[in-house]
Amino acid sequence: MNVAVAVSGGTDSLYTLATLREAFGNHHVFALHARFKEQITNDPVPALKEQCHNLNVPLHVVDLHKEFNELIIRPFIKAYADGKTPNPCVHCNAKVKFGLLQKKAQELGANQIATGHYVSLIDHDLYGKALKCGADSTKDQSYFLALTPREQLQTAIFPLGTLRKTEVRERLQKMGLEVPLPKESQEICFVPNDDYRKFLQSSDVDLLSEGRMVMLDGTLVGKHKGLWKYTEGQRRGLGVSWSEPLYVAHKNHSCNELVLGTAKDILVDTCTAQDINFLVPQDNWPKELFVRTRYRQQAVPADIQFVTNTSSSKKITIHFHSPQLPAAPGQLAAIFDKSGYVLAGGLITNDL
């Protein structure tokens, strides 16, 4: 068995490489680094080469910046222009890390690919090989893998699933390994300083400018600075003085209007999602289901209704057991069981 370890230059992937090299030996493990940018500052490759030399494992570097631009960056920009709030990490996992990079690993002779995601892949009696939340709830990345096809995860290895971040750092220190990029990666890797507004403004896509900001009953309360700068459920940065805290209820893209409401007024009990990716066959789902529509959100109880439509992709309606803040179209809805196994994922729509 040969294992390719996807390495970025950070703590998690370096530990993954070191621990698998120890488990399988240097003749069955190699490192694989993908370049996602044409021009790179603080290039980790020289330091990665040194660490791979110390571990006596080969390092392969592949240039995927053109593919990354077409598959991730351009759709990210277009989604904002269309009034959505995309999650590029979800698509990167599905199309790049467990898509293009996995294919490259196979071409180089790997049977399996390992990453530093904080998740576990467990043989379940009913589900088969199933994805489960990481033990470190502050780092758990199961949400971001809910759109990755089941078959692409079957040959994955996730050594960090049972560990906490502090343990990973301590173990690396004991191994005497120095992290090439000691600083934690930013929220969106291709957006400088996590300033997505500045990034979008520098793009070549037309973005809606300022427009009316109204309450749910139509009362005009001000002007917004462009719908793409706001997301459903947002509270901070609205620039409106009101007797109660206001939140974004929804964005009316057709007339460039931002609709606000108080917390109790904007709560919803349903949302819809499409392009459903099944990580566990629906027939094997338990009765108790839980849904997350945001990364940092705790999964909440919900019922799932499958909607029959004429399109080839499946669509679902999510019925929350208790009212929730509105979910942003373009974000991911991930479905879990009560033990933290990921059952499916889909993209949230603005259908009612």
Swiss-Prot record:
GO terms for cellular component: cytoplasm. The record marks 117, 331 as: Interaction with tRNA. It catalyses: S-sulfanyl-L-cysteinyl-[protein] + uridine(34) in tRNA + AH2 + ATP = 2-thiouridine(34) in tRNA + L-cysteinyl-[protein] + A + AMP + diphosphate + H(+). Residues 139-141, 294-295 are annotated as: Interaction with tRNA. Gene3D superfamilies: Adenine nucleotide alpha hydrolases-like domains, HUPs, Translation factors. It comes from the Bacteria. Keywords: ATP-binding, Cytoplasm, Disulfide bond, Nucleotide-binding, RNA-binding, Transferase, tRNA processing, tRNA-binding. One of its GO terms (molecular function) is tRNA-uridine 2-sulfurtransferase activity. Disulfide bonds join 92-189. GO terms for biological process: tRNA wobble position uridine thiolation. This is tRNA-specific 2-thiouridylase MnmA.
